[in-house]
Amino acid sequence: MPEQGCGPPSRVLLHSLRSPTVMSPSSPSPSPSRKPKPVPERFQVAKTTLWFDRIMTKTIIGGGFTVIVAVFGILFFLLAVTIPLFQGAEVKEGQSLAPAAQAAGTWGLDPSGTQPFVYSNGKDIFFLDKASGNLKPVPVALPDNETVCAHSYNSFLSAYPIATESGKVGVISVHSGLNIHGQVNAHGPTKAGTETSPLHPMTENGDVPGRISGVAYADAGERKIFSTINETDQGPRLLLMTLEESRSLLHEGEFIPSGFHDLTDRLDGKPVAMLPGNSGDSLIVATDTDKLLYFAYNENSETWEKRQTIPSPLGDGERMTTVNWLFGDMSLVLGGDRGSLKIFSLYPHPQADGAALRLFGETKKFPPLNGPVQHYAASGINRSFLVSSPHAVRLCYGTTADIRWESDRLDFSPVQLAANAEFNSMLATDGQGRIHFFSIKDRHPEAGSKALVGKIWYEGYDSPKWLWQSVGGTDDYESKLSLMPLVFGTLKGTLYALVFAVPVAVMAAVYTAHFMPPSVKRVVKPVMEIMASLPSVVLGFFGALYLAPRMEDKVPALVCMVILIPSLAALIAWFWTTRPAAWRNKFSNGLEYIVMTPVILLCAWFCWEYLGYWLEQPFISLTRGIMSLWGAGDFQAASFADLWRNGFGMPYEQRNSLVVGFVMGFAVIPVIFTISEDALSNVPPSLIAASEALGASRWQIVRTVVLPVASAGIFSALMIGLGRAVGETMIVLMATGNTPIMDWNIFNGMRTLSANIATELPEAAQDSTHYRVLFLGGLILFSMTFILNTLAEIVRQRLRKRFNVCLLYTSPSPRDRT
């Protein structure tokens, strides 16, 4: 035991080393040339440490490579899903055969595209066996005393409208017994056959004038339309008959004639073609004077009105050779004898009385074919269609006016074209009676660069627009898949969020890092970091259910806050600088928040409760007076929302971009604040001390020294905050109307790419066009964040290099440090 008072062992050891060594006489004297040898083991690292170090090194390297592989894996997956959207159509010629018997008539294909059939005014429909080339007759149920004199083919309904010599009309529906996949029906007919509707005369008294030379048919569900061209001694007559379903509680309703109409007197020439619409309220007639007539059914008067006459729709004296409906019966495809190909669609036309009337107008124009347009076949699932000239066939898509495929030159001249409803098979007949079969592979005609980013003139709209309306309530809905409204909404929401978040977060970080007392900073910074963990769904609910209703009528109060609070803070700061130094030194640095917090809260409460309301009505009156002087007219407004709607003519929604800016700002502020504060706190103290030694004030130090040095970190914080705002989903989904519109109006909503994916992806069919376009939106988000982060890293490295050089020149040398 050491003696008391000798001090700690280290001090005793130091004393013993400094005192002379006392040697006993018997001990040998050490050799002056012998030195103690170092022990090699003291410099060796334990094997377990080396083993653990190697494992951790490989683990970290492997983790880094895994992250890189994962990122590129996501990229490759998104590319694999979206690349098919930009691929064109593929049409391949299959077998070509000549039926064993002459097959004159009108050809059709069943929905599966595997069973061709033909009809030619007889009492049999012939189904073609593609393996043997034989025609199998299937009888048509017609009365023995009726003879068919005219027919046509409706590919959308897979039916033949027929007319008999006695002036009666009906429909022969054809079914092959196969489903769309070419398999035997599990439900419904399992064998090829026909169904014939009851025959009805085209006049009320049954006395039909002349012989029917043309017949057309449309089915609108509860209403069916027949139109015929009757050859009489006075010339062709155009007759129209409507059938409506009779309702009964005991049995299914039967279709009975409900109206007979003779439209001959309202024609400008002789009718040569007619197209009743499957909507049941429209009829298109082409005349020999090259005019296109549009008749519409008036529900009130129960009459057919001629609404429009289009003279020479192809222009330059070119005559129409084909007039056909596009799928949906909202657009007409017109072909001419010089190869012109145009689309006319229904859309509102302003009238003299201020009303708008839906009329046809030219919306699309295709490059001309190399000969007259002769034949036409339309898809039954989208706006694709086929047209042919004497030696070429072209596949087009009506919505985007794209040519999906075109044959270079056929070795035969098509006499007929037919396609199945699924539009994956086509047949063409030639002058020698041979039938040529083609397979069509065009899975995503609705997509493509023009549809996704270009302005498209959609049906029902009076001009080309960027629109996103991916799904509709009917099978013939025209999908609108422009991504521009979604990209615009993403940028709009991000902009309004950053306008609110960046000044608050950066200024708060500056104050916390260099002005706030350390004791308070130890509380504030963890609270802000905890705030970053708030679920976005909670913030979204807060914005939608609490903040949006309260902000709807408080916009003037918010404007007053934005102006008054910074002004009042600057005024108090100026007043503080005018006080004597002896008086200011009584308060510790960083305690300004004790004075400013109550003032800011009191100012915000005063603006919210009183000032906004006091200024709202005078502002409305002043605006009304100014707009009256400008001749903008008078309007009524009881609030700012009414002024915005009625006075400025812009929409004002409760859930709008202003709400998104505030709520998303709360999600972005903690991210920007935390990273910025770390960058500001890590500025070398030597720079700050040198600035203080030169007599700079705290604000001068922050403005001229701290902010430039920390600019790289602050810029990184802004970019990370930008990425957080770009990818936000739930806040935008809940706090806005989620409407895909392109409008910078701050009181309007928007839809972002991320919110659109979250909303629509669960309902999208796998591998459909809609499904792939949603993944394309994800690829755009991925690219946006990747590009932004890459640019941010480049800028950050340059800023860091620049100010590291400055630090190198201003830092003391090692000799100065000693």
Model feature map: region roles:
Residues 174-184, 242-251, 296-302, 345-354, ...:
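Short loop/turn segments immediately following beta-strands, especially the blade-tip
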Residues 809-818:
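Conserved small/polar residues in nucleotide/adenosyl-binding loops
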Residues 673-675, 697-734:
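Transmembrane alpha-helices
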Residues 639, 643-650, 732-782:
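Interhelical loop and adjacent transmembrane-helix boundary motif
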Residues 517-525, 593-600, 689-716:
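Amphipathic cytosolic juxtamembrane alpha-helices at the membrane-cytosol interface
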Residues 571-582, 677, 681, 685, ...:
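C-terminal transmembrane helix and the adjacent membrane-cytosol boundary/short C-terminal tail
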